[in-house]
């Protein structure tokens, strides 16, 4: 209840993790056939589609926002298409208005993988309020976490009822079953961790913004690119991605940082269009960006002195 109030959403179910959230969302909407999705996301976005016996259809991303390109969605729609599953990459809102318009025109469902989107608002609304269902991850790597966990969010009470049944073995009461379900519940221990962390969310969001701004100040004189954040957005600064000129430069930067026990992540590499179970779906922009992007260390206790050191090492690698 406290989480729902904090996010200002209609209905929320606490689940065991973000991947189960995606799988339950697909099941609750009774999706079949093809699901249009992004090649630039964590592997769970695509693997959940395949796990639920649907076919992922990759639509390439926008070079600047790193989100699925809504202008390319319509041309990927076929008679077998049932939904769009888009990711708010690094918590940056997709073009939700354009995606909604395409979905309504063609009678498609919309799921947003909002694993990174906790705390982001778009046009004054929680980013989790968009789509038929939004899914969250509360893994320990996220800015708000329950050690391990996830959630599904919807404004439709019937969809909520279906997802509640599916996360609890199919139970509709102690002795009645409404269908097939799994054990997607979470525990009181994880919920307690979430309640503890929830008190500090605003402080964490504020600190992460400060740290991201400081990173950017230190790196703007380098030949690097930063993700473009959508307009009318209060961004959560869940990650600090940096795009280098080439993979060669990226690897040189990572080598130097690793030598100093600093370990940035290659989010997201490889492009999901290159997965062995996704064939013949070239996504050139995603594939190019995925080879050149890393996320630098970011957590609310990170100091400016540590950022100074990280940036000095990056500058040394890029320039020499």
Name each model feature, range by range:
Residues 15, 38, 87, 137, ...:
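Conserved residues at the C-terminal ends of beta-strands
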Residues 112-146, 161, 173-178:
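Conserved active-site segment immediately N-terminal to the catalytic lysine
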Residues 13, 36, 57, 110-111, ...:
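Structural detector of well-ordered beta-strand residues that form the stable sheet scaffold
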Residues 27-114, 121:
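PLP-dependent aminotransferase-like
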Residues 1-34, 48-51, 58-60, 125:
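Phosphate-binding glycine-rich loop
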Residues 1-2, 6-10, 71, 75, ...:
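PLP-dependent aminotransferase class I/II
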Residues 128, 136-137, 150-156, 195:
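Short beta-strand-to-turn element immediately C-terminal to the catalytic PLP-Schiff-base lysine
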Residues 14, 37, 58, 152, ...:
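Conserved SAM-binding loop
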């Amino acid at each position: 209840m406290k989480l729902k109030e904090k996010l200002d959403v209609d209905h929320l179910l606490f689940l065991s993790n973000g991947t189960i959230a995606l799988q339950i969302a697909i099941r609750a909407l009774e999706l079949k056939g093809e699901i249009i999705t992004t090649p630039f996301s964590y592997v769970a976005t695509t693997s959940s589609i395949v796990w639920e016996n649907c076919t992922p259809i990759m639509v390439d991303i926008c070079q600047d926002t790193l989100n699925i390109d809504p202008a390319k969605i319509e041309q990927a729609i076929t008679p077998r298409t049932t939904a769009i599953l888009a990711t708010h990459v690094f918590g940056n809102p997709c073009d939700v208005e354009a995606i909604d318009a395409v979905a309504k025109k063609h009678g498609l469902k919309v799921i947003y993988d909002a694993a990174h989107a906790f705390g982001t608002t778009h046009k004054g609304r929680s980013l989790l309020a968009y789509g038929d269902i939004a899914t969250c991850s509360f893994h320990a790597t996220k800015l708000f976490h329950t050690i391990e966990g996830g959630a599904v969010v919807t404004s439709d009470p019937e969809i909520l009822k279906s997802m509640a049944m599916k996360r609890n073995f199919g139970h509709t009461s102690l002795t009645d079953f409404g269908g097939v379900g799994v054990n997607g519940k979470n525990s009181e221990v994880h919920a307690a961790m979430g309640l503890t962390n929830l008190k500090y969310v605003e402080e964490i969001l504020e600190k992460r913004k400060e740290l991201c701004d400081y990173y950017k100040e230190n790196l703007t004189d380098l030949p690097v690119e930063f993700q473009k954040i959508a307009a009318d957005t209060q961004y959560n600064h869940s990650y600090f991605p940096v795009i280098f000129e080439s993979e060669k430069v990226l690897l040189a930067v990572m080598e130097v940082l690793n030598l100093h026990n600093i370990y940035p992540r290659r989010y997201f590499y490889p492009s999901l269009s290159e997965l062995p179970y996704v064939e013949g779906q070239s996504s050139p922009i995603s594939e190019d960006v995925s080879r050149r992007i890393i996320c630098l260390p970011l957590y609310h206790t990170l100091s400016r002195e540590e950022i100074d050191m990280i940036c000095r090492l990056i500058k040394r690698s890029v320039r020499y």
